Every structure is written in C-alpha cells, then in structure tokens.
Amino acid sequence: MRACVLFVSPRREASNTLAVTNIFLNTWRAAGHRAEVFSLYDLSIAPCRACRACQTDHAAPNCAIHDDMDDIFESILQSDLIVFASPIYSWYCTAPLKAAMDRLVYALCKFYGEMRGPSLLEGKALCAITTCGYRPEQGADLFDEGLRRWCKHARVRYLGLFAARHMGYDVPFMTPEIAENAKAFAEKIFKNM
C-alpha cells in the first residue's frame, strides 16, 4: 500500500508532530508499505480561489492554480491512504493544511460544476496525526469532527485521529507511552485498510 503524508508544522525537524509521524512512518514502512511525505511549510500552496476551473474536467484535478499542490494531487491520486500530520493551533490544523484541504476537496470532488461528477478521492482512506496542548478530547476534538465531515463529503473512509498531548516546552514530549501508542495507531491503520 502507498500513503501520501502531508506534514505541516512550522517547527519542522523540532516538531513534536514529526516525532510521532516518524514512529507512524517507521511502523508503516516496516510492514512493507510505501509513503511519500510532503512538508507543507517548505512548499508553496495558495488558498482556493473558488473559481471552479477544476469542475470542468471530471477525470483530473484541473486546478487553475499551479503550485506545489500539483505534486500533492498526483501523489494522493496514486495513494491508498492520506495522512494529515499537523499540530493543533487554535483548535484546528495549521493554515497550510487547511489551504491544502480546501484545494483537495474542490479539485478532486467534482460536485460543484454545471454537471455533478465523481469524487476522485472515493475509496481512499484518511487518518490524522496531531499534537496539542490540551487533553486530546478538548484539544483535537474539533479537528477530528472536521475531518469526519470532510471525509464523508469527499467519500473517503476516515480511519481516525491520533492525538498526543504536549505538556509544555519545559517537559520532554516523547514518552514510551506516546511512542507505543503511535506505533499501535499505525498498526491499527494498516490492518483497517
């Protein structure tokens, strides 16, 4: 199986989200699966313009904006699993992921043109990896619900969200429990594919 991972933390290599994502990826790859990772803070991704150019072609993204989303569209169309990996800021994902989510749902769901078309995402699966400062049930719950609705709309199977709490910059983030839970989450995901 193949995964497309959208990693979205401004802290890049120092990111707690990346630490968890790497455990997920190591487990995923150890099971013989492939993954392509995009670090969205290192890319150029403009927000959707709602121009609906994408709705004129029901077989391809056909987005009027040509930036790094072109490579992401291609990777997602070739993947079985989409992974959103973002810290939670203000109870939702970081801004580059939100821009990518908007572009994905419009360019790949052909529901908004003169004639209704298919979802090019149909049959794919999605999971998310997050870190947040609050307990996950209060810090990641709104993002989790947003993903459920995004997936239902796009006809994507939502496999769940892994959230780990960051207790503060003066406290080491990665614990054996977080590492074990991240590995178990990855195993659960590929068993449910």
Predicted regions located by residue number:
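N-terminal beta1-alpha1-beta2 submodule of the flavodoxin-like/Rossmannoid cofactor-binding fold
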Residues: 1-86, 90-109, 113, 176-193
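Glycine-rich phosphate/pyrophosphate-binding loop and the adjoining helix
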Residues: 137-138, 145-193
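A short small-residue
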Residues: 2-5, 127-128, 162-169
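Short histidine/acidic/glycine/proline-rich micro-motifs that form metal-
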Residues: 10-13, 88-91, 133-137, 167-170
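Cofactor-binding loop segments of dinucleotide-utilizing enzymes, especially the Rossmann-like FAD-
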Residues: 8-9, 40, 131-133, 163
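A generic structural signal for alpha->beta connector loops
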Residues: 32-34, 60, 123, 155-158
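Short, glycine-/small-residue-rich phosphate/pyrophosphate-handling segment
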Residues: 112-157
